[in-house]
């Protein structure tokens, strides 16, 4: 066991006249345990070969302080010299010690008092003997009574320990011995500044030779400017009842160079207040002065050695840094700082992180190094660092990782070598090694080499990055089988592909799989056989490359979903067009029948039932067209705040009394351009959908707000461009939508409601309207907490025009003239016979002269036969041989002012793009009624060009 050196300082003080009894030793002793073999200062204090000493609390008023210095294999020379100087190395058995120069006067002891009492009693007895005749027997009885009382009191005091003789003196001697033999100077003064105690050490320090030369410490240091402030602070601390210490440096020491030396001496001065008792009428002040010059010199030597060690480490020919578990660099030597271009004057611990200096996927290599709890681990890593100027530096890490016993990571220490440096003979080889390592660890794909049994031999940084949750560096070092990073369901396919690589096949199909434990991450493996003709890589049987295809899979799923929605939309649009033709014929025929039947007619209800169901079917077709984005929109500038305010009453009636409707209007909303009626339909559909999700009641919140482009970019919604938007949200507190259902909610005819309670077209129509408007719709939902639909409408930024003034709600239609009759000549072009027949009868019933054609070619022939005597043409859009837009272009060549109306089940903009921008025409969407047809024709004829 090597010796350990410690310094123990005990400041002992006591008030004058205090007594140390066995009771005090038993109940208030402070035990100080010292290693007599190791503690030289303890020997200097007179504590020799004692495992334990007990000092009474009343006698020792200061503290026991242990200061540990550096562990040494042998005691220092200074310590041995000081030990010899004190002269206490040999064991002492007597109680001799230097007497103090100033000692408080002691009052008479108990024995002395008893002796005086005894003498007085003997004198009284002698006087009685001489004058017994005169005094009589009464005096003798009184004297005997007094003596008996004194005897009883003595016996009682001795039995109870109240009267003690030698024991009190022994304890006083022990305390005095401890104080007087202290190597530190000790002086105690009363409230008037008079010294009541001073030991020989204090006299030597101050140069006093007798009691008259002893001065209080504040007077000794009064002429020392360097110490006056320290004495002032100590005095104030004592006045406040506190203990304090200061260290001062005095030229020549306290004795002012009495020994002929003016060398500076360091002192540690301690002060504390003591209870003075009634005799001193106030507290005493105990001062202790210790010469710590050797200690300060040792500290200076230690500091110089530390500075030299830091200087050696800073300018070593290798870089060095240390990082905490969070990856923040807490130390960086000058060599590495110079390599990286880091200004050490600006560097502070934690101001740099490993991510700031490690390039590419190098962090994956560093993070993969882990140690077992309570151990450390060393590893070698080749990677690139990033200089301040952006250039890379090829280095080799000798990396040490420590882990605490509880498993918490500790501070890392790393030596960094520049791989580009070396002798001339190894430059080419070193350069090739650097280039390969840089390529290997910087490759964007994971690379691993395996042996013939599928065990992993080596991996690059990207491999550890991708598969960090499956394998770590320890597993790679143990040569774990590569199949462990493949999901169990795909391992058979993976092993077959790996066997093909072992067999030397050149073309092997890649293997797609997911990470074990995280099936949301997709991985694709590529196998390549190893042909090693030179025998340099005899162990390697195949090289496996892997890329993460999670984003690719997500894009593929999005594309498939988009194509599916587009295909469904095209199908829905085609079906809707055909249905519109059928419904148009039914509705117009119903109107013709109703004109010939009164309400009292028995068949009138049946005809009305036919028309009502036809209109209901027409509503479903409109929803299909909305989803397929083929309905006609009339966009206008809208202020959503006003639109929702006008809708509030309607929405409140729709959601019912059990559901609270809350509308949160955003401030200063930007204008948007949308079809007012269609937007109202969107709001109604979403509110009704939210209502149905809360059968037991809840809350629906409609919210609007502006989102700048910068905030929109942070949302990470799929396909949402970075732009300014006005967001319309519909939030409910309903049951929520499961994830598997959430992907299908916008598909037409998809519904989770019971049969007869929903068509499955509500959200499909919302989706189509928003897409056709140029906006985006997303749904966030959590089962059991509710659903939020978010609609992003692009901000309208353009100069305001008179006809684009924001509107709050749908303007009331101006009442049209009830007279729908006319005498104009109409050319009706329609390939559907039923629709054409109904249109002809409807217009003829209003007084029009109608000519009919089944195609565009036939219409041109009729126009030629009539010599152009046609006032208006009503034409379908999609027809065989020649469609409606082509017919319009041909007619305008010879009849530029002819009026033209298109009728179609598709949206107006679906065919308007095929016409000149200045083309003028009317539009009537299918299905339409007899009245709607007559009204449109009448308005077009009366319209002034």
Swiss-Prot record:
InterPro entries: CheY-like_superfamily (IPR011006), HATPase_C_sf (IPR036890), His_kinase_dom (IPR005467), HisK_dim/P_dom (IPR003661), HisK_dim/P_sf (IPR036097), PAS (IPR000014), PAS-like_dom_sf (IPR035965), PAS_4 (IPR013656)
Residues found modified as Phosphohistidine: 577
Single annotated GO MF: phosphorelay sensor kinase activity
Chain positions with 4-aspartylphosphate modification: 876
Keyword entries, A-Z: Cell inner membrane, Cell membrane, Kinase, Membrane, Phosphoprotein, Repeat, Transferase, Transmembrane, Transmembrane helix
Enzyme class: transferase
Ranges of residues in domain Response regulatory: 825-941
PROSITE patterns, per the entry: HIS_KIN (PS50109), PAS (PS50112), RESPONSE_REGULATORY (PS50110)
Residues covered by the Histidine kinase domain: 574-797
Effect of deleting the gene: This gene cannot be deleted or disrupted in the absence of a complementary copy expressed in trans, indicating this gene is essential in B.abortus.
TM segment ranges: 111-131, 139-159
Domain PAS: 171-212, 313-341, 432-505
UniProt catalytic activity: ATP + protein L-histidine = ADP + protein N-phospho-L-histidine
GO annotation, cellular component aspect: plasma membrane
UniProt EC number: 2.7.13.3
SUPFAM superfamilies according to UniProt: ATPase domain of HSP90 chaperone/DNA topoisomerase II/histidine kinase, CheY-like, Homodimeric domain of signal transducing histidine kinase, PYP-like sensor domain (PAS domain)
Superkingdom of source: Bacteria
PANTHER family named in the record: SENSOR HISTIDINE KINASE, TWO-COMPONENT SENSOR PPRA
Function summary: Component of a regulatory phosphorelay system that controls B.abortus cell growth, division, and intracellular survival inside mammalian host cells. This signaling pathway is composed of CckA, ChpT, CtrA and CpdR. CckA autophosphorylates in the presence of ATP on a conserved His residue and transfers a phosphoryl group to a conserved Asp residue on its C-terminal receiver domain. CckA-P transfers phosphoryl groups to the ChpT phosphotransferase.
Protein name: Sensor kinase CckA
Species the sequence originates in: Brucella abortus (strain 2308)
């Amino acid at each position: 066991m090597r010796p350990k050196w410690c310094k123990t300082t005990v400041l002992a003080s006591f008030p004058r006249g205090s007594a140390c009894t066995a009771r005090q030793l038993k109940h208030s002793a402070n035990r100080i345990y010292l290693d007599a073999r190791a503690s030289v200062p303890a020997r200097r204090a007179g504590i020799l070969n004692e495992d334990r000493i007990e000092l009474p609390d009343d006698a020792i008023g200061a503290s026991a302080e242990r200061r540990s210095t550096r562990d040494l294999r042998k005691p220092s020379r200074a310590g041995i010299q000081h030990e010899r100087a004190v002269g206490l190395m040999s064991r002492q058995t007597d109680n001799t010690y230097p007497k103090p120069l100033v000692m408080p006067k002691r009052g008479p002891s108990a024995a002395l008092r008893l002796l005086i009492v005894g003498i007085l009693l003997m004198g009284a007895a002698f006087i009685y003997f001489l004058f017994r005749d005169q005094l009589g027997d009464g005096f003798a009885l009184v004297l005997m009574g007094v003596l008996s009382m004194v005897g009883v009191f003595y016996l009682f005091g001795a039995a109870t320990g109240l009267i003690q003789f030698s024991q009190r003196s022994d304890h006083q001697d022990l305390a005095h011995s401890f104080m007087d033999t202290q190597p530190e100077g000790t002086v105690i003064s009363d409230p008037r500044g008079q010294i009541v105690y001073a030991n020989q050490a204090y006299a030597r320090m101050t140069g006093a030779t007798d009691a008259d030369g002893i001065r209080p410490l504040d007077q000794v240091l009064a002429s020392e400017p360097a110490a006056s402030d320290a004495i002032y602070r100590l005095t104030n601390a004592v006045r406040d009842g506190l203990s304090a210490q200061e260290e001062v440096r005095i030229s020549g020491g306290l004795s002012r160079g009495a020994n002929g030396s003016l060398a500076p001496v360091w002192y540690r001065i301690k002060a504390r207040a003591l209870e003075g008792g009634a005799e001193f009428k106030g507290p005493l002040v105990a001062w202790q002065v210790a010469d710590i010059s050797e200690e300060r010199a040792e500290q200076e030597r230690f500091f110089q050695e530390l500075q030299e060690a830091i200087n050696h480490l800073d300018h070593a020919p290798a870089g060095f840094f240390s990082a905490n578990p969070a990856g923040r660099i807490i130390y960086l030597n000058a060599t590495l700082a110079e390599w990286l271009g880091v200004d050490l004057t600006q560097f502070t611990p934690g101001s740099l992180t490993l991510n700031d200096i490690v390039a590419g996927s190098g962090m994956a290599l560093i993070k993969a190094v882990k140690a077992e709890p309570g151990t450390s681990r060393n590893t070698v890593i080749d990677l690139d660092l990033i200089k301040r100027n952006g250039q890379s530096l090829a280095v080799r890490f000798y990396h040490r990782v420590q882990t605490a016993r509880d498993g918490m990571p500790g501070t890392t220490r790393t030596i960094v070598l520049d791989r580009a440096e070396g002798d001339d003979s190894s430059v080419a080889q070193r350069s090739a090694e650097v280039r390969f390592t840089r390529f290997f660890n910087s490759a964007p794909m994971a690379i691993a080499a395996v042996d013939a049994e599928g065990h992993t031999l080596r991996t690059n940084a990207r491999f550890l990055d991708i598969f960090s949750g499956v394998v770590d560096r320890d597993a790679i070092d143990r040569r774990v089988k590569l199949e462990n990073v493949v999901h169990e369901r795909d391992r058979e396919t993976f092993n077959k592909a790996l066997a093909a690589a072992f067999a030397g096949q050149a073309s092997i199909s890649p293997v797609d799989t997911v990470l074990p434990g995280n099936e949301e991450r997709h991985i694709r493996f590529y196998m390549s056989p190893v042909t090693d003709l030179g025998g340099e890589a005899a162990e390697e049987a195949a090289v496996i490359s892997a890329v993460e295809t999670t984003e690719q899979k997500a894009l593929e799923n999005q594309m498939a979903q988009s194509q599916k929605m587009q295909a469904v939309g095209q199908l829905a649009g085609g079906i809707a067009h055909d249905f519109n033709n059928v419904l148009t014929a039914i509705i117009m025929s119903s109107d013709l029948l109703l004109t010939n039947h009164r309400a009292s007619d028995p068949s009138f209800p049946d005809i009305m039932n036919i028309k009502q169901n036809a209109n209901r079917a027409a509503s479903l077709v409109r929803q299909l067209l909305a989803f397929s984005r083929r309905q006609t929109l009339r966009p206008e500038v809208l202020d959503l705040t006003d639109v929702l305010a006008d809708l509030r009453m309607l929405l409140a009636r729709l959601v019912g009394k059990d559901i609270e409707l809350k509308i949160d209007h955003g401030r200063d909303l930007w204008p948007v351009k949308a079809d007012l009626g269609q937007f109202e339909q969107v709001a109604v559909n979403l509110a009704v959908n939210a209502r149905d999700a809360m059968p037991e009641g809840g809350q629906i919140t409609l919210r609007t707000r502006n989102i700048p482009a910068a905030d929109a970019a942070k949302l990470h919604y799929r396909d949402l461009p970075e732009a300014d938007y006005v967001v319309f949200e519909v939030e409910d507190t309903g049951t929520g939508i499961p994830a598997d259902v959430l992907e299908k909610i916008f598909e037409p005819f998809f519904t989770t409601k019971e049969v007869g309670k929903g068509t499955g077209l509500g959200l499909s129509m919302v989706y189509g309207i928003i897409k056709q408007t140029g906006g985006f719709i997303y749904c966030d939902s959590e089962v059991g907490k509710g659903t939020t639909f978010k609609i992003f409408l692009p901000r309208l930024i353009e100069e305001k025009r008179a006809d684009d003034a924001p509107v709050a709600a749908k303007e009331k239609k101006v009442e049209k003239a009830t007279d729908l009759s006319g005498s104009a000549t109409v050319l009706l072009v329609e390939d559907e016979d039923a629709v054409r027949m109904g249109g002809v009868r409807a217009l003829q019933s209003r007084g029009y002269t109608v000519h009919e054609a089944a195609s565009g070619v036939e219409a041109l022939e009729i126009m030629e036969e009539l010599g152009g005597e046609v006032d208006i043409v009503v034409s379908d859009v999609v027809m065989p041989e020649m469609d409606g837009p082509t017919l319009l272009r041909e007619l305008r060549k010879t009849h530029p002012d002819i009026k033209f109306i298109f009728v179609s089940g598709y949206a107006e903009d679906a065919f308007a793009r095929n016409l000149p921008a200045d083309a003028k025409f009317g539009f009537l969407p299918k299905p339409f009624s007899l009245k709607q047809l007559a009204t449109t024709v009448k308005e077009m004829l009366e319209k002034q060009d």
